[in-house]
Regions:
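A residue-level marker of the well-folded mature domains of exported/periplasmic proteins
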Residues: 2-10, 24-374
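Bacterial N-terminal signal peptides
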Residues: 14-24
Length: 374
């Protein structure tokens, strides 16, 4: 099935004109069919809108935007990118989307602040013939494509790592863990939470659990303060934190409570600060999600959708994911990787995500990792 966008319709009109010229003796041909993930580029440019959700998490401005822009330039050198960040405000993202649609974008790549609220954006885009690619978070409303990571597996990876740490320390039966989950408006957070519970339930006692609006590190710190009061600092043997930013808040709360030997704390996103906490022994692990292939896939989907082609998923292949409205969305899901001190060099360093110099700043130069890395 081909998907017809406004740009694709204009391209079809151009193709019809070219065929008329061909009948008059001018040589012109058109091609169409199924778009494969790869290195082929589109000659005619169009306008692509990219909406990212927030800037508190370092990845979006540092990696997602530049990686997407790099891939789009490679796939469609003449394309024009319109970009906005919503700063975790759903209403702001709505206004940004409306402005882009008014400007005349031909395809929208949307990382929703609030998946349910984003259905309005999706419906407005569809009403104007503009296809929508859901990026990292699945917006409701029946988007054309979705690319993310296997989010249930992310939670499993975090839960498995936390259990492993507790088993290594022999503390799994000696106390309780605290769970600091992500934002209740982010469907990914629900998947992380479900995956973690699948691993942790029945294996450890969960003394306190919180959902954290806006993925706020400050809110996470407050929640951890509450958990320390209700559970007791000495009873907390581990903390499931859904991402690195909140892990920073968790660790700050533990330190403020006078906890000298920090329990294992999980994270996600492989932020540079998270990696540095791992090598400093403050955070047990993080989850590395290879953003470059995610951004590349989103760009491939956007180009295919805007030109009326059907994206085949490339090497990863397509699966289907059901959104909140029961729509089955063609999707690419990328596998996450657990990162501890032992495999930092084999993951984020070998992939070029960070260099040793970026990780081993003066404050961390004396850690075992940096000493061994030279």
């Amino acid at each position: 099935m081909k998907r017809t966008s406004g740009f694709a319709r204009r391209a079809a009109v151009g193709a019809a004109a070219a065929l008329s010229l061909l009948a008059a003796g001018c040589g012109a041909t058109t091609t169409g069919g199924e778009a494969e993930g790869g290195d082929s580029s589109v000659e005619e440019g169009f306008r692509v809108g990219l909406l990212l959700p927030e800037s508190k998490t370092a990845r979006y401005e540092k990696f997602d935007k530049p990686y997407f822009e790099e891939a789009l330039t490679d796939l469609c050198p003449e394309c024009e990118l319109s970009y906005q960040n919503a700063d975790q405000e759903s209403s702001k993202q709505q206004s940004q989307a409306e402005a882009m649609l008014t400007e005349g974008i031909d395809v929208l790549v949307l990382d929703a602040v609030d998946s349910e609220a984003a259905a309005q954006i999706v419906n407005q885009a569809k009403g104007q013939g503009v296809p929508v690619v859901a990026y990292d978070r699945l917006a409701e409303g029946g988007v054309d494509y979705y690319v993310s990571f296997d989010n249930h597996r992310v939670g499993e990876v975090q839960g498995e790592a936390l259990l492993q740490a507790l088993e290594e320390e022999g503390t799994a039966d000696d106390g309780q863990i605290v769970m600091i989950n992500g934002s209740p408006t982010d469907p990914n957070a629900a998947d992380f939470k479900a995956g973690a519970h699948q691993i942790l339930d029945g294996q450890v006692e969960i003394g306190a659990e919180y959902d954290t609006p806006d993925w706020s590190p400050d809110r996470a710190q407050t929640q951890m303060d509450q958990a320390i009061t209700s559970v007791g600092a000495d009873e907390i043997v581990g903390v499931y934190s859904a991402n690195d930013g909140m892990a920073a808040g968790v660790i700050a709360a533990l330190k403020s409570a006078g906890v000298d030997e920090l329990p294992p704390v999980t994270g996600q996103d492989a932020e540079i600060a998270g990696i540095q906490r791992v090598i400093a022994g403050e955070q047990y692990m993080t989850v590395y999600k290879a953003i470059r292939p995610e951004a590349r896939t989103a760009a491939e989907m956007a180009v295919a959708a805007a030109t009326g082609e059907e994206y085949d998923g490339g090497e990863a292949g397509l699966t289907e994911v059901e959104d909140g409205g029961g729509n089955m969305i063609p999707s690419v899901l990328i596998d996450p990787v657990a990162v501890t001190e032992e495999n930092i060099e084999d993951t984020v360093v070998s992939d070029g995500f960070y260099t040793i110099e970026e990780i081993c700043t003066d404050a961390y130069a004396d850690t075992d990792f940096c000493t061994e890395a030279g």
